[in-house]
Amino acid sequence: MNKLIPLPREFFARDTNVVSTELIGKTLYFQGKTAIITETESYIGQNDPACHAARGRTKRTDIMFGPAGFSYVYLIYGMYYCLNFVTEAKGFPAATLIRGVHVISPENLYLNGPGKLCKYLGINISHNKCDLINNNEFFVGDIGLKLPYSTTARIGITKGTDKLWRYVVTDITNLISQYNVQP
């Protein structure tokens, strides 16, 4: 049985697209629930019109400016929470949106969509600005799972749709069952 430990801050303090692709297959642990990350999107700096920090630093986007390895949680449409992980060097606003996961404990469940995964896991605005490194209840670990993924345009946005910054698992069949994770 593999012991799940948090990834180091250095993992997140890199190019956002590298982090987004390498998060595919990583394990999200949140308050007793374990899930494999299956879909991510990158939002990178003030030159990305879809990035919340495109217009500069605000109270809402302050967390995006770092340090890396913290959660950025916000509400969309007045009803759904979205989970992001802050990336890049401190002072540069960027984050990876977690769009989909495959829950492996306490049950086997595929959740496609950031709102669905936050609702199931119980993630809300109180989980904004959580340190994912020094935390035993909310973190990302690595069990060595490598999943094939496709790169596509981001979805659910109206600006920056030309960026191929969405990463989604292409075939998860029979891969996740190989791993037994103990948080």
From Swiss-Prot:
Mitochondrion: present as a keyword of the record?
no
Q: Does the keyword Nucleus apply?
A: no
The GO biological-process annotations, alphabetized, read as: base-excision repair
UniProt-listed CDD domains = AAG
Q: Which of UniProt's keywords are assigned here?
A: DNA damage, DNA repair, Hydrolase
Q: Which GO terms describe its molecular function?
A: alkylbase DNA N-glycosylase activity; DNA binding
Stated EC number for the protein is 3.2.2.-
Per its UniProt record, what InterPro entries does this chain match? Formyl_transferase-like_C_sf (IPR011034), MPG (IPR003180), MPG_sf (IPR036995)
Highest taxon of the source? Bacteria
Q: Where is the signal peptide?
A: none
Family per record: Belongs to the DNA glycosylase MPG family.
The protein's matches in HAMAP family, at most eight in alphabetical order, are given as: 3MGH (MF_00527)
NCBIfam families reported for this sequence: 3mg, PRK00802.1-4
Q: What is this protein called?
A: Putative 3-methyladenine DNA glycosylase
